[in-house]
Each structure stands twice: as structure tokens, then as C-alpha cells.
């Protein structure tokens, strides 16, 4: 018998704004540029792919506010791990988990925006939320990455892997990253997006910076 509440228009508009900004960054080649940087980092340190992969996907989601951006780098993670004779499930598993953990720590994710709206009447600021979620998720991801380094047998000791390799079932194809036509625009789009994220944190943390309507 409770009367339905009004729809969360403010939260919906915030989510729409984030999606629009991320779409503009994608159209300008910003996401492709981020994937290029991630690929360069992973290929430069292939033996540390299990540790670096979750850090990369965490940062992707943290910056963009959605875990969907992490999909672009997963093929690179799998390829680097296979070339280094590391079980791909180790970096891939924790990388996907890290991207989802970052949703609760991203200042522009739908989850954080919704939580901020729910706690609006309890004198809780965006900074209050982030100072808990960011350290907690980073520590959890790093601990998970350390445990992932021992998941399953080494590929050299895995009879099923050796069997499939001998029979020619494992054909590792080179992942080709999309070329960036205008690097300047891509870099600029990423910088603008990150700068906007910083402003969001400031506006969400200090009441005096937000507009007040009568």
C-alpha cells in the first residue's frame, strides 16, 4: 500500500551524461589510444602479466565508469599470457574481476552515482565514498592477483594443453590493435575525460561548489 516514489531523474541524467562523454571519447579514438598504451605495457613486461592485467582493467573502468571498456584489452592479455607460457585463465580471471571492482570505486560509474543519491540525506559526500571504496578495491584486486599466480598447473606440466598443442588445436593469432588516425585528438579526448572526472569529484565532495536552487 505504499505510494511509489518519483523516478530518480537526477541519477538517470548523470548516467546519461557519463555515457555521452564516454561515447565522445570512443569516437575520437581515445579508447583505442588507451588500449595501445595497455598493450605496450603488457608486452614490455610479459612475465608480470598476471599482476599488470588487473591493474590495467581496473584503471580502464575507473576512468570510463563502465566495465565494458575492459573488453578491448582482454584479447591482448590472453595473447601475452600464452606467448609467455602462463595460463591465460590466471590474468584473464582476475582482470575481469578487477574491472567489476573498479565500478564501485569509479566516481562516474552508475553504481557510485546511485549510492551517492541514496546517501544524500546523511551528509555523505562523494569523497567519503571514494576514500573507502578505492583503497578497499585496490587491495582486494592486488591480493587476488597474487593468489591467481598459482591457479592451475603450469602449461608445461598440463597434459591436456600439451596434447592440444601437439594436435595443432592451439593456433594463437596475433591481435591487431586498431590504428589511431588522429593521435592528437585521441590523447586530447582522454585528457578532457580525465579532467572532467576530477571536476566531478570536487563538485561532489564540496557543497559550496555545487549550484543551489531556490
Residue ranges and their predicted role:
Residues 2-84:
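Membrane-embedded alpha-helical segments and adjacent helix-loop junctions characteristic
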Residues 47-51, 105-106, 111, 167-172:
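Small-residue-rich segments of transmembrane alpha-helices in multi-pass membrane proteins
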Residues 49-53, 92, 189-192, 196:
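Hydrophobic alpha-helical transmembrane segments of polytopic
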Residues 76-93, 204-213:
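Hydrophobic alpha-helical transmembrane segments and immediately flanking/interface helices
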